Amino acid sequence: MYTRRARRWVSGAIAAVAVVALAACSKGGSTSTSPDSSASAAAVPQAVTDLIAKYSGPSTFPPPGPPIDVTPLKGKKIFDIPSVPNPFVQSISASMKEAAEKAGMTYTKFDNQAQVSQWVQGINQAIASKQDIIVLNGAPDPRALGPQLQAAKAAGIPVIVMHFHDNDMPAVPSCEGCTDITATVTAPFNEAGKAAAAWMIKDSGGTANVLIVGGSDILPSPGTIKAMQDEFAANCSGCSNTVINIPVADWNTKTQGVVQSALQANPKVNYVYVLYDAMVAGAIPAVQTLAKTGQVKIASYNGSPFALDAIRQSNGDLVAMNVGEDTPGIGYATMDQVFRVLLGQQPVAERTPIRIWDKTNVAEAGTPAKAGVGYGNAYTSGFLKLWGLGGGA
């Protein structure tokens, strides 16, 4: 019921992520951790309950820096190069355009089909058309664009890389692929992993046996897995987890088979956590084929509409949880960094929000779900006020 729609989304997303990750050289494999044999399910710690509560409602807005006057930016030109034409990135681009136009800037989006050669063309076009700033949105891998980023820097055009590095990674220029970029807008990959682990601890009553399905050729993935394992180790003595790796290039064709085999090898697994929504399409038929709906719950990260719809349609018995991202919040945070860079200010640590979605609140994302819906307007109104363009209190 969910697979066909999900696969339509994945067919566009897989190509993007495959080129976002440089030549995948990692091979599939697995590791596992288990509780002591004497461990029994303990009461869910208050820290777990508090963490879930923190992320179960609409976002609140922490200003990333002092207020700024954006009036000098009227007429400046921003060039947006998105990584892939999927609803998640399209929603971010729409919010960037909205914020740019409120500041009187000229916004241009370079549509493409997630090919490195097209990203190269985009940067070359931005340089030739004398843009004032370039944003790699979603994000085209800066490690694959070294010569073009050098050329942009030589032309005096700052480049911002968005949603590629984790919040915990070093800042520019020490982050990977950051030699010739100006600033980043990082993403809460590890934070989302910790929140997901907390949800599974609570939902299972402290007995989660989790199959974590990663793609280690995606830059932040190892850190996300470690964040999840640290949460289990700290707050769930009765939990266990096994990690398997599926290289990005194989997500569309091998996720179902690999997950199905892992579930057969370990019948005690009761949660499958895929690090990114693009693998949900393969996890669903893996669980269904083994007739484990209601016994094995699928969870993921990104907040893609099809994944949220699957929660609602299965009432949480098949796809049970998703840690989603506020795409308008991401777009406005990106523009805040853009404004500060163009004003000659130091970049700030932009932080973008997440929300835990499950059957108790997924209706707030819309029916059908829509990207960026259900997170509230705290970020958009907060940024507008910070820029002197209106907004709420």
Question: Which residues does each predicted region cover?
Answer:
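Hydrophobic alpha-helical segments within soluble ligand-binding/sensing domains
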Residues: 65, 119, 182-209, 223, ...
